[in-house]
Structures are given as structure tokens and as C-alpha cells.
């Protein structure tokens, strides 16, 4: 056991990286020192630091802890890391330590990693960070059930036409010639935790540019990634490994959660002429409804408002009647909405709409989501 005196600018994450390796678990330091809030460190505070341990190599990528031993290599690159495949398993060979990690599976043009860090676990070990984010219980409930339909905090996909997708909502780099949502997530990380951004991305030449708050572009060594040739670079296994490792950091995870719930600002609280001048937040107000709408927006963002408008028309009610009405009216709209969204958009309809809806509905039976009207409560007004 070692002892360390907290210095200005220290976080549990960077202390863990310094003493336990770059994938060191800050939660172990917190446990040993009885720290319940990971952002409550004080300059001069004495911490006990456990001795680093080398974990066994796991055999399945979906349960493999990618252990970042690249701390002494700045920047880590293909000289320090090589990649091999065994069947469909992608293995990172860390040449400075001899360690091998099965961290993903190959598919088509790239790879995928299911990840091991679940939002439900972060809700427990990251509770102090969630308090800092000022997340409401309703927002946490909605995030838990919708993230189950998407991915883990360290999930990666590089095989489809979006080039690189990351995290609980699988934010994408964007197709060739198009902006993507992943740069907006990284921009949020850069603004809130610049040291973490620099460690995981900036030191490798990554930056964000031309942001509009929702989408933007990545640049690599000063060059904006725009066309297919530019973005194809991000299919390289080294980038998947870097993003997977970043997705294991509690501060990066907290930004994912905040960025995910902030998606509601894009569509749920905004009045729409398609909805007769009302906002969805005035019409569908249960946690169940918000979870369904958010899940739809992640999958098919341009479909949500129109599909709800069609559900209202099908019900024979006006938006004003729904806004002033009872839970029965909301239940009717949801019923019609779920029927319509299975085919809304034709060939481009929501992926697995029925299965995703049932997954969310199951949370009602377990008491993790409320179907009651006005049960959804947002803290968006008090967040900075």
C-alpha cells in the first residue's frame, strides 16, 4: 500500500492511472479511503493507494477488460500496439508489456465491441458524479431503460456506414460528407473535463470543429474528417481501442449520461407546428412515454414528431384536448403511436420497434418506470 498527497488538479481517475496503470480502477481507491463522492478531493488530502495488479486475460470480447498499459507511451501508436485476429476475435498486442487483450470482434469493414460497463452500474458507483450533474430520478429512470436498447458505456462499432459509433447511445462520426453526433459528445467532454479529453483524444491529434450543439466534425492532426477516405481512418483498430478505454473512465461516462439526457432538449421541450403549436412535454408526460420517445429519437430522430402527430389524428382528439386531458388520453396516444411507429417511414422505419417498446414496458412491471401522467420530472432548468 502506498500513500499519496492530493495536488491541485488531481482527480481519482488520473491518480488511478498514475499509480495503477491507465486503466486503473479509481473505485478501488475510493473504497479504501471511504470516499463516497469522487469529485470531493481536497488539496493536501492523504490517500492510500493499493498496489497495482495484473488482471487475467479474459477470453470473450464482451466481458474482456481492456487494460490500458500505454501510460508511458506518448502517444501510443502502432509501434507500441499491434493487432491480430483469431477467427473473429480482434486481439490487441501491447508490445511494451507482452500483454494480449481480446477486446472486439471483426465484422464487415470494421469491428464491434458490446462493452462491459453498464449504465445501471454507473448509477451506483457514479452516484456522486450524477449529483454533480443534477440528474433527476425520472431522468435516471428514462436513461436506464433506453440505454438497455442501445449499448454499454464502452461499446464500439466501426463496421457500418457511420465509420465509428461509441457509447450508450452509439453516437456516430456521421456518414461520408455528413456531420455526426459523436463530435458533439467529445466537445462536451472537452468543455467539462479538458484534461480527460486531452489524455484520451487530444494527445493523438483529435479535435472537434464546426459544432452546432447537436452535430459537428472531428479533425485529426488539423485535418477535418469529411469524406469517406478521411473518415475511414477511424475504422482502424487503434481508434476502437482508444475509445473503448475512454469509455471505462468515470468522468467520460458521466458526460455520456448528461449528453444522452440532454437529447430531450432537441425535440421534447420544443413547440412544433406539426403538434398544433404544442411541445411533446405538454402532451406526453409519463416516464414511460418519455422513454419511448427518446428511444425512437435515438433510432430515427426525424420520425418522432410526425409519428406522434399521426397518432393524435388517429385518436380523434386535438393536441389541446390531450394537454388538458387525463391519463386515459395519454394512454390512447401511446397505444396509437406504438402501432404507427412500427411502419412509420416505410423501409426506413424504426429498427425493432416492437421489441424495443416491450423492453421499455417491462420496466413498468419491475417498478423502474412510471406510466402515470406527469410522472416525468426534468432538472434541465437547474443544470448549467
Language model regions located:
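Disulfide-stabilized cysteine-rich extracellular repeat microdomains
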Residues: 9-11, 34-35, 46, 52
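Intrinsically disordered, low-complexity Ser/Thr-rich linker and spacer segments
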Residues: 1-3, 50-61
